[in-house]
């Protein structure tokens, strides 16, 4: 298949998925991927306000700020959003899986969910004052993420703090038992 045919096929698939009100987030959380998802979500909202949207997530996580941009936009929609994890929802991907209202958060049977505290990648340089500013900011970010998990799971704050101290990997069933999911989805017809 030539490159032009591949792009045409991708466009057809994307169009069909949007017509079915399915938005797929199958990549790391970046400014670009967040922007693309937000545009699709708002396209569907403007096209038919209040009609349900399914947000399918398969993401290793990524940028906290980009992820919370998607989160905030989903919360602003009048269309009810159902999240479905398929494959992996790790780090910020797991936070995105919680942006749906209670009762609308699902995963496919073989999905995995990983929660942890935020981290800063790469070498950090600067004056002691700058490092102190970064440390305070990451602690604020950690508190925001803990708030999301506490609200979503109804777990006590100390349980969440302990859970995210290191990477906590869960199967779909374990994530459901922990309160991160409302159910295991065996068919999209069940939505």
Curated annotation (Swiss-Prot):
- Give compartment(s): Cytoplasm
> Single GO cellular component annotation?
cytoplasm
Q: Which Gene3D superfamilies has this protein been placed in?
A: 2-enoyl-CoA Hydratase, Chain A, domain 1
Q: Could you tell me the EC number(s) of this protein?
A: 3.4.21.92
- Pfam families recorded: CLP_protease
The record's catalysed reaction(s) read:
Hydrolysis of proteins to small peptides in the presence of ATP and magnesium. alpha-casein is the usual test substrate. In the absence of ATP, only oligopeptides shorter than five residues are hydrolyzed (such as succinyl-Leu-Tyr-|-NHMec, and Leu-Tyr-Leu-|-Tyr-Trp, in which cleavage of the -Tyr-|-Leu- and -Tyr-|-Trp bonds also occurs)
Q: Which residues form the active site?
A: 91 (nucleophile), 116
* Residues annotated as signal peptide: none
- Protein keywords: Cytoplasm, Hydrolase, Protease, Serine protease
What is one process in the GO biological process aspect for this record?
protein quality control for misfolded or incompletely synthesized proteins
Q: Name one GO molecular function term.
A: ATPase binding
Cross-referenced HAMAP family? ClpP
The task this protein performs is described as: Cleaves peptides in various proteins in a process that requires ATP hydrolysis. Has a chymotrypsin-like activity. Plays a major role in the degradation of misfolded proteins.
Q: Assembly and partners? A: Fourteen ClpP subunits assemble into 2 heptameric rings which stack back to back to give a disk-like structure with a central cavity, resembling the structure of eukaryotic proteasomes.
As for family, the record states: Belongs to the peptidase S14 family.
NCBIfam families in the record: PRK12553.1 (NF009205)
UniProt name for this protein: ATP-dependent Clp protease proteolytic subunit 1
From the broadest rank down, the organism's phylogenetic lineage runs: Bacteria, Pseudomonadati, Chlamydiota, Chlamydiia, Chlamydiales
